[in-house]
């Protein structure tokens, strides 16, 4: 008798035939546990043959020491599922669809029996849907995987599609049993993968996006090992939607321990699909392609990627970053999509490049890479030898924009042995070394940056300290002065950090402001103004206001700043401060852009106090700033609110932007804040009524009579379609299809047309004006 234990009870299950198909019995046990409200189903030691087992909410599958859950070969043992949001068919040994609070734990093993599954003769038509995955989750939430081993899956190993709240710890995947042997395939949000080992024939940790309607975000892979014949830590290849805030931290990339396939004579796949790469012949069983591969080739949105701490050996190159158009369509053209590829930082990487190929960072015409930072990178390169490197040194790199992205996609070696970059806007190299191994031979330079690469200085080289004229303290910030400032007056862009950060948070809008200022030959100032809005000296205080004024004076003293072209830009907390500065110091600004701003901190205290999803913390921050709630300290709240001061800013050109969905779905600043700020600046006849504001905040729509009619290429429909636009005097309000968002690209284009003292320029942009689509910032407060 075998015992299946769950909850406080235990269910006895009898099996009369050793090693028979146990699928039905185990499925009954899982269903029984679910019917009792959930609990644990324990798979005891021994071999258990199963087809597909459907997981249930609140049920944990526990693999005891010595337990082997072995997948039966052949699709007839699996319930093949088609999903409306994903092409192809899906099956798995453990299948979790629309489940919540599920777990797979223990020290036992799931054996995919991959070598027993037949694959088509033509690898190009590998028919992934005809082979079962190891574990598959879709539209699931609250997934916990811990301790077990997955061996030789027939296809991908562990798959998350449109999932949320995922944790995997101390999981081992050893999978070389068939084609497409990925380790983790991640299309999910709020994911933590820690202390795992993947030894696989295909990509090990693969973050991707197939569904444009689902945002893949907040993914962290920490202290993990990747051993691969393909890519170690990857974003892509599928990038149809949004992927953002992905971190690979303190990881290792190593050579795999087995051939591309098991390749035993007893295997039905013997001799097939064994990829032999001459470049890696010196490794025992070959090696991988890119240790880190970050790709955007389907016209989607990839941003906020961090690699911090990576030891590399056994891969052709350590770093591969690629924008492309593998489907042959222009970037951002699929319905509802908007191409963005930016904000990538790769830091503290050391190791070996095992081939003559170079690491690369490259885009294509119309699809460029923006804001890439390499810091503390030390790579020893194998080199290609004299003869091959002499040819490669003068070789023209072909256009391979539609080709499948891999580090060796360029039809031959690149003109550098260490790093090659092309079509990059904003590349920063800080303490970066690519050097030949001892005895290595290669005539190519270590690093080649084509003329189509914009190089930026490291942030540390821009750091300044500005002495406050109010309290004498030294306030941090960053100042960029372009070379052109030696010969002529240049504009100054001042960008303001968001609510919960200081100037150390250089992602948004700091990185955007620096990059765009450098492109235009402008000066750029990024002040701290007393840091996060959680202390009395921050959050619109007199000290914070004066810090910005002092910083501008500091810039003027060190650069030839045009006083009629000083611009201000900020979003969220930065939008709050931008409006406050417009009202308190209107004499400075040629133009101000405020995205998703907080305009009345007293009102916002009441709103966030009633919010969930953690937004109530903003009310607590305001109480810490003001010394109590609004009823206790009304003067403090009024003093720090832009609506108190904006009447003085009617002579300043001001553009206010916000998303119609802000204040909903976890977003924290209701749309009424932007609208009421506009009303402070507008003539009475142009103001938005209180009834319309209430309707917008309640329904996330605009009354039909108020809807914007027209087009603006900076707000493409439907993904960023304008819902309402009002202009009055020097002020413009744009409410568009977004959450807590600012459109800095639109704002900066408009700012560049403004001059202090001149009439405001409301010229509508054209498609030609919009050179780079989609610098819309989804903000972190």
Predicted regions located by residue number:
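Extracellular/periplasmic carbohydrate-active domains that bind, remodel
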Residues: 18-455
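N-terminal cap/lid segment of alpha/beta-hydrolase-fold proteins
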Residues: 456-486
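Short substrate-entry loop that stabilizes the transition state in hydrolases
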Residues: 486-490, 495-537, 601-602, 664-666
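Mobile cap/lid helix-loop segments that gate and shape the active-site cleft of serine hydrolases
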Residues: 500, 504-509, 590-591, 597-598, ...
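Primarily recognizes the serine-hydrolase "nucleophile elbow" in alpha/beta-hydrolase
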Residues: 501, 556-558, 564-613
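Alpha/beta-hydrolase active-site loop
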Residues: 539-559
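Active-site-adjacent alpha-helix of alpha/beta-hydrolase-fold enzymes
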Residues: 626-628, 660-728
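Short beta-strand/loop motif that positions the catalytic acidic residue
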Residues: 656-658
